[in-house]
Regions:
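Conserved C-terminal "lid"/linker of ANL adenylate-forming enzymes
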Residues: 135, 161-162, 171, 192-238
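Conserved C-terminal helical docking segment of ANL/AMP-forming enzymes
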Residues: 15, 141, 154-159, 175-211
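Gly/Ser/Thr-rich phosphate-binding loop
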Residues: 1-39, 52
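Conserved ATP-binding/catalytic segment of the ANL
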Residues: 62, 70-141, 153
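Short Gly/Pro-enriched turn/cap motifs at secondary-structure boundaries
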Residues: 38-47, 70-71, 107-108
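C-terminal boundary motif of the adenylate-forming
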Residues: 65-67, 114-116, 153-177
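Active-site glycine-centered loops adjacent to acidic/histidine catalytic or metal-binding residues
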Residues: 13, 45, 115
């Protein structure tokens, strides 16, 4: 139990760079969560001292050297790249992944986090999911976290996951404990109505209920989206 005046400081980062940014929990709830539930992504705060953060154009290819034209304007969603004293410069004996994840900038190295996000006018970073999990449909890009947090605000939804098997944006839904299977048709109808009310979600064409999402063993929290996508295909739902 925290004291009444206590707070938590969840860090944003990765094995290759930790921490990158941080925002007090009270500020997340009071100042940013309402925007999260409208599809803005999750605010992870300001960069910590000695860390530089840039948001660059999304690419699945290696980028050998940094150039100013890679950087996006505030408010645009792109790849998150960081540099600083706690950022690793290479993967041991792994040139292919080093080339895909590191960008040379003179004497410095930028690390591509593998995440997508955007920066607001206050300099805060907003997390929008993993780059590899984005869904491409009809020339547009859908990002997982902005979409999912809209639906997660529904009282019957425990968690949701956007996947895109065969290019069809599909929302997998795990319901809160105690929700009956018989309630699903009405919940699905409500979720479809919510989807049409937001530009981040109005391309979602499938809503499927999953009994219990696959998650990683280490954290018991990271959703196995690849497994969910295969499950959707195997069920003939895509």
């Amino acid at each position: 139990m925290l004291p009444d005046d206590g707070d938590v400081f969840p860090p944003y980062g990765a094995t290759e760079s930790l921490p990158v940014a941080c925002l007090p929990g009270r500020e997340i709830v009071a100042k940013t969560w309402a925007e999260t539930e409208k599809g803005a992504g999750v605010c992870v705060g300001l960069p910590v001292p000695d860390i530089e953060v840039k948001v660059i154009r999304i690419s699945d290819d290696a980028i050998a050297t940094f150039s100013d034209d890679l950087e996006l304007e505030d408010g645009e969603i792109g790849e998150i790249a960081v540099r600083g004293p706690m950022v690793t410069e290479a993967y041991f004996a792994d040139e292919p992944n080093t080339a895909l994840s590191k960008i040379r900038d003179g004497d410095f190295i930028w690390h591509r986090m593998g995440d997508v996000g955007w920066r607001d006018r206050e300099g805060r970073l907003w997390f929008c999911g993993r780059k590899s999990h984005r869904v491409l449909v009809d020339g547009a890009t859908m990002f997982t976290v902005p979409c999912e947090k809209i639906f997660d605000a529904h009282p019957a939804v425990y968690r949701s996951a956007l996947v895109g098997p065969r290019g069809l944006p599909t929302l997998c839904v795990e319901l809160e404990p105690g929700q009956r299977s018989a309630d699903w048709p009405e919940i699905e109808r409500q979720l479809r109505h919510i989807a049409q009310a937001h530009p981040q979600t109005n391309r979602i064409s499938r809503f499927v209920r999953h009994p219990s999402f696959p998650v990683d063993i280490r954290h018991n929290a990271k959703i196995g989206r690849e497994k969910l996508a295969k499950w959707v295909e195997a069920k003939g739902l895509s």
